[in-house]
């Protein structure tokens, strides 16, 4: 087994879009005539040793024979000497039909694989999402919440941290209580409503009458008893008043009985 290919195994397991290759000995003499020989170096991880180019190269034939062969091959696609060279990997089915597989470009002697359209879209979307996430994280760091005012923006976070550090060493002044706002009252009402729905108040239970009678009869009886007691109290009070207040007749009789005998009328 070729030991040179063993060293390329870890590189082939990686994403080919992440790697590059160059040979410093070829860079000063690189030109359109030898660019395919440069790309066919054994140390190049992008070159397939089973391609038709390798077969033609081993037979020392011209690359024009590739049009009459079928299989994987490499062809020079674009040349902009001395900086840019583009090489295409394709699968040839017939002399007039070939399917592109990958494109490689050589810039200043360094070989890269050109990304496909799906990789470009994925990279752009990932970059966009990353920057959006960073922007949202930055914006959320300036968001503030107050129970009576709700959410607000505070872009003086550094000043606030500095002032907070200074105030920790000083005695805190008493904070004046502020009246509740409409936002705070609405939030409190909503929280109380949620608590009542989760934990409803128990219904009042009816007490049983121990005598088994009608509650209305019991109430009437108590009223009658109270009325009788009130009447008896009134009667006693009237009798007392009658006893305490003497009548005129009694006063006259008492006056006649008390007259001395010498002053009684003689018949």
Curated annotation (Swiss-Prot):
Residues 202-267 are annotated as: Disordered. Pfam families: Med6. Residues 205-218 have a biased composition (Polar residues). GO terms for biological process: regulation of transcription by RNA polymerase II. GO terms for molecular function: transcription coactivator activity. Disulfide bonds: none annotated. One of its GO terms (cellular component) is core mediator complex. It is found in: Nucleus. Gene3D superfamilies: Mediator complex, subunit Med6 (3.10.450.580). Keywords: Activator, Nucleus, Transcription, Transcription regulation. The keyword Nucleus applies. Its main location: nucleus. Belongs to the Mediator complex subunit 6 family. Component of the Mediator complex, a coactivator involved in the regulated transcription of nearly all RNA polymerase II-dependent genes. Mediator functions as a bridge to convey information from gene-specific regulatory proteins to the basal RNA polymerase II transcription machinery. Mediator is recruited to promoters by direct interactions with regulatory proteins and serves as a scaffold for the assembly of a functional preinitiation complex with RNA polymerase II and the general transcription factors. Component of the Mediator complex. This is Mediator of RNA polymerase II transcription subunit 6. The lineage of its organism: Eukaryota, Metazoa, Ecdysozoa, Arthropoda, Hexapoda.
């Amino acid at each position: 087994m070729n030991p040179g290919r063993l060293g390329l195994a870890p590189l082939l397991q990686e994403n080919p879009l992440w790697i590059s290759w160059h040979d410093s000995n070829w860079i000063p003499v690189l030109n359109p005539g030898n660019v395919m020989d440069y790309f066919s170096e054994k140390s190049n991880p992008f070159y397939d040793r089973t391609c038709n180019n390798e077969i033609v190269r081993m037979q020392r034939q011209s690359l024009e024979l590739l049009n009459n062969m079928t299989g994987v091959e490499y062809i020079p696609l674009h040349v902009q000497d001395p900086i840019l060279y583009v090489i295409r990997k394709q699968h040839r089915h017939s002399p007039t039909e070939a399917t592109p597989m990958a494109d490689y470009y050589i810039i200043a002697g360094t070989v890269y694989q050109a990304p496909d359209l799906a990789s470009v879209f994925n990279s752009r979307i990932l970059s966009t999402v990353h920057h959006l996430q960073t922007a949202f994280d930055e914006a959320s760091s300036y968001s503030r919440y107050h129970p009576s005012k709700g959410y607000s923006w505070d872009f003086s976070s550094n000043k606030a941290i500095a002032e907070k550090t200074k105030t920790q060493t000083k005695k805190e002044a008493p904070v004046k209580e502020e009246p509740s706002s409409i936002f705070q009252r609405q939030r409190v009402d909503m929280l109380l409503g949620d608590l009542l729905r989760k934990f409803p108040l128990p219904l009042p239970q009816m007490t049983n009458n121990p005598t088994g009678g009608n509650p209305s009869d019991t109430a009437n009886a108590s009223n009658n008893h109270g009325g009788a007691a009130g009447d008896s109290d009134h009667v006693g009070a009237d009798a007392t008043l009658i006893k305490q207040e003497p009548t005129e007749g009694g006063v006259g009789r008492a006056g006649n009985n008390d007259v001395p005998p010498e002053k009684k009328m003689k018949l």
